[in-house]
Amino acid sequence: FVRGPAYDALTGAAGAGQGVSDWPTYRGDSARSGRTDADVPTSLRQNWSIPIGGRLSPPVVAGSSVFLAAVDRHEIVALDRRSGRVNWRFVAGGRVDSPPTVWRGRVLFGCRDGRVYCLRASDGEPVWTFRAAPSDRRLTAWEQVESVWPVHGSVLVLEGGADPAAGDGAVVHCVAGRSMFVDGGMRYVRLDAVTGQLISETVLDDRHPETGEPLDADVQW
């Protein structure tokens, strides 16, 4: 766990909630419903376009900004919602394979370097970083160096008592790893969304959670 320059400024700040026209996470909300209550016109027109280059994730929208990942360049890019002007860029330690989640003035995302990042939405300053991977082992995948236990970009944030382990606080849910059957399995990690501190970790591997025996011990061919 590493505190960033914006940690003290945001730790005690509630931040603005979601607006009706926002789309702050993958598929719009924590239920991944893919729906919105905003009025969407049947006739659309293009307001702006901007060249960013390379593979891009789908965008998310919160307040006056649009956020997306430039996947292979390890970047999170923030754009002005009305003009498309680049507000800031942040370079992470590996590929970011899907859009970030914007929550109460914070931009949260997982990275293929095995970490979860929290940035200040207004300027991209780091708030905190947490290594969800059990160690800092690396390998090469698709011509990129990344963690043995990568974290997918679109982390899930649940708040308002949705997670009993955190009471009324907000929780970041993410998984580090590639498969239950290699490299010691996968790590299901829950973090305090404000402080970045670990709430709990569950190892998902090839052993039965109650007996400790291999899951395929009783499989008959």
Identify what each model region corresponds to.
Residues 1-57, 67, 71, 75-77, ...:
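Aromatic (tryptophan-biased) beta-strands that constitute blades/sheets of beta-rich domains
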Residues 23, 53-76, 93-117, 144-188, ...:
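Repeat-blade elements of multi-bladed beta-propeller folds
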Residues 42, 82, 103, 112, ...:
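Short, ordered coil/turn segments that flank beta-strands lining enzyme active or ligand-binding pockets
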Residues 82, 94, 122-123, 149:
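A short beta-strand motif that forms part of the nucleic acid-binding face
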